[in-house]
């Protein structure tokens, strides 16, 4: 398994802002407007509720300090209570409404992924990188908590923190500016450290994919009935179990290294949190003892100073979390944009005509599978004339299936050309070309249907 190579440490193809623009585009094209309207409203309401909670107690204390009438005190308490109840109800309602837009965007991306897999060029199905990206794209959108949907949650939390940060900054504008700068500086350092450490998983994603793929293969062999006879006859049970356990130990070691790296991000953040909160508390206590700060203002500034640090930390922490999610979504986008070696919609149209005879010719065709040391087919010339019946006979591995795949356009030759009525098939729309053939290969899968429907591949 490769570790420490350039391959495992490649940078993401798309950054946070490019992924954000991409996700907004997916939502816009799918007309999922609620991710914009409801998401923004939810952020405003959530921040507003926190601000109202901050102002509640200082407002009551201020009324008591100034010796106002009981009616004024009850009015303040009643007004804030009604406001908080309304904001809480609105927050719960918007949270529920926001679920549908996020899920619809995720379903759209899952649909795009499924269409990519179903309609991709056949050589991509032999490409290890394509298969790895496909598996990662599935994991990134398989549940509501994965990156494709959690992306919107993170952006909502960032907007909430930005609104709260602006409001608290206004409240603290009368305090020492150096205190605010200290809070911001320590939070920025924490964010940068967390961002660098949280990229560890992305930099080693190829290594993780190798472990996951091997585990999936061993599980398939151990549970698939078609391998049961060989496992029992040759006594392979202990070997399969040992292979599973050894791979699981390697994967466990990988996870331990990953979580150890992530732990350092939390340690750094905790140390900086102690520094910035300690400085804020010390300054407020000095104002109270030396300048006689009123109790209501002390409580307001005390809560605002604590909250200000939390808003700043929240902004940067959520950006770090969003950055990590965007790494996963970058993988999804790389999969969806994986290059196609064949031409489809951009190829020349090829009309199927029942009154037109078709001749297939292989002209000096060679084919070598990726990673192979020699050609499976070498310098082959073959002509299949209209109406001609041919039988291809050969040993296992001689290239019979490969030859048929070349004729059917599932593979392009490494050298030479495949000609249809004298024309190279590569410029054509490959899907139009496929409509000319009906190939039955030795691979099969039995559907949960009648024998007739399995043979006909349709309902009769």
Predicted feature descriptions by range:
Residues 117, 244, 362-364:
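Conserved catalytic Walker-motif region of ABC-type ATPase nucleotide-binding domains
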Residues 345-460:
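ABC-type nucleotide-binding domain
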Residues 53, 57, 84-126, 130, ...:
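Juxtamembrane helix-loop junctions of ABC transporter transmembrane domains
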Residues 29, 138-151, 203-210, 220-223, ...:
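An intracellular "coupling" helix at the cytosolic face of ABC transporter transmembrane type-1 domains
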Residues 236, 280, 299-337:
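Cytosolic ends of transmembrane helices, especially the final helix of ABC transmembrane type-1 domains
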Residues 36-93, 169-201, 275-282, 286-296, ...:
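Transmembrane helix-loop-helix hairpins at lipid-water interfaces of multipass membrane proteins
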Residues 2-11, 113-143, 208-242, 334-347, ...:
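Short intracellular "coupling" helices and adjacent cytoplasmic loop segments at the cytosolic face
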Residues 1-48, 70-75, 130-166, 214-216, ...:
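Membrane-integrated ABC transporters
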């Amino acid at each position: 398994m490769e570790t420490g190579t350039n391959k495992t440490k490649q940078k993401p193809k798309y950054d946070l802002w490019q992924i954000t623009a991409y996700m907004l585009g997916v939502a816009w094209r799918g007309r999922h407007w609620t991710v914009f309207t409801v998401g923004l409203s939810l952020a405003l309401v959530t921040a507003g509720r926190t601000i109202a909670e901050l102002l509640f107690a200082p407002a009551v204390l201020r009324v008591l300090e100034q010796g106002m009438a009981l009616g004024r005190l009850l009015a303040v308490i009643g007004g804030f209570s009604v406001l908080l109840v309304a904001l809480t109800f609105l927050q719960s309602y918007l949270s529920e409404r926001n679920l549908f837009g996020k899920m619809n965007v995720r379903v759209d991306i899952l649909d795009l992924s499924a269409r990519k897999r179903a309609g991709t060029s056949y050589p991509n199905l032999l490409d290890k990188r394509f298969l790895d990206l496909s598996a990662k794209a599935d994991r990134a959108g398989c549940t509501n908590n994965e990156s494709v949907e959690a992306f919107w949650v993170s952006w909502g939390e960032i907007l909430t923190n930005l609104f709260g940060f602006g409001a608290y900054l206004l409240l603290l504008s009368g305090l020492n500016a150096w205190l605010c700068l200290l809070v911001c500086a320590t939070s920025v350092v924490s964010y940068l450290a967390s961002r660098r450490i949280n990229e560890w998983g992305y930099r080693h994603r190829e290594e993780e994919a190798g472990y996951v793929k091997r585990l999936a293969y061993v599980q398939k062999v151990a549970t698939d009935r078609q391998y049961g006879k060989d496992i029992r006859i040759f006594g392979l049970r202990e070997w399969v179990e040992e292979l599973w356990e050894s791979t699981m130990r390697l994967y466990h070691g990988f996870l331990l290294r990953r979580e150890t790296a992530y732990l350092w991000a939390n340690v750094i953040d905790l140390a900086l949190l102690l520094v910035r909160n300690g400085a804020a508390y010390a300054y407020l206590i000095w104002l109270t003892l030396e300048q006689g700060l009123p109790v209501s203002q002390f409580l307001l500034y005390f809560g605002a100073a604590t909250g200000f640090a939390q808003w700043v930390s929240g902004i940067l922490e959520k950006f770090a979390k969003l950055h990590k999610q965007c790494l996963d979504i970058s993988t999804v986008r790389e999969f969806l944009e994986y290059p196609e070696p064949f031409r489809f919609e951009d190829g020349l149209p090829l009309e199927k005509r029942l009154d037109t005879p078709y001749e297939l010719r292989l002209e000096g065709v060679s084919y070598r599978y990726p990673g192979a040391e020699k050609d499976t087919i070498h310098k082959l010339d073959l002509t299949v004339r209209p109406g001609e019946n041919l039988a291809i006979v050969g040993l296992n591995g001689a290239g019979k299936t490969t030859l048929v795949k070349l004729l059917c356009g599932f593979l392009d030759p490494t050298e030479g050309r495949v000609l249809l009525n004298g024309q190279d098939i590569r410029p054509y729309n490959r899907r139009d070309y496929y409509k000319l053939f009906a190939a039955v290969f030795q691979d099969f899968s039995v559907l949960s249907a009648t024998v007739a429907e399995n043979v006909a591949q349709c309902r009769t």
